[in-house]
């Protein structure tokens, strides 16, 4: 039977080792990032969610607007790859399977890019972007989140929080899990 102090020593040592090995550096900003989860796993999950969105959401039948979105996206893809090549860095989008959809919803003024390059634009944002340049700015912003691997960071932080909560629960003899929620 392991005592609590020994548990904390082992857990703390393992946690520190894991955190140090999971630290990486963002290629452009040189900001430190925590990446505990494999990107391929997150990309796979995102692709499944994206396919579900495509099946359950009303997609726009405006082929001209969708084509414009795809052309802008293609130019951004090329720009990202060219930039990383120009600074001799590995292209973080090399394994992306880019795909674009236009969701028919004029009330939602948004766009998003999932890990792996799955991009959705809501028709509602088009009245705000006004033209190709405005749309490119919005799409570039969303794609930048995927390029910077923000989803991997968020998922890693959530994992740390869950593991930390479980460890505290073990250390406190179940005080967290036995707390009644109102």
Predicted feature residues:
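A Zn2+-metalloprotease active-site environment signal
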Residues: 1-182
């Amino acid at each position: 039977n392991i005592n609590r102090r020994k548990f904390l020593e082992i857990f703390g040592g393992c946690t520190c080792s894991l955190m140090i090995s999971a630290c990486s550096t963002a290629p452009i900003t040189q900001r430190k990032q925590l990446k505990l989860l494999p990107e391929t796993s997150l990309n796979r999950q995102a692709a499944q969610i994206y396919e579900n969105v495509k099946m359950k959401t009303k997609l726009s039948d405006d082929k001209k607007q969708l084509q414009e979105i795809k052309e802008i996206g293609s130019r951004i893809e090329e720009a990202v790859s060219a930039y990383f090549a120009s600074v001799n860095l590995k292209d973080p989008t090399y394994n992306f399977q880019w795909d674009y959809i236009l969701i028919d919803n004029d009330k939602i003024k948004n766009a998003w890019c999932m890990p792996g390059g799955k991009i959705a634009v809501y028709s509602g944002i088009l009245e705000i972007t006004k033209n190709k340049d405005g749309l490119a700015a919005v799409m570039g912003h969303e794609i930048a989140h995927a390029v910077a691997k923000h989803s991997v960071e968020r998922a890693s932080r959530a994992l740390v929080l869950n593991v930390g909560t479980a460890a505290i629960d073990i250390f406190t003899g179940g005080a967290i899990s036995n707390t009644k929620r109102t």
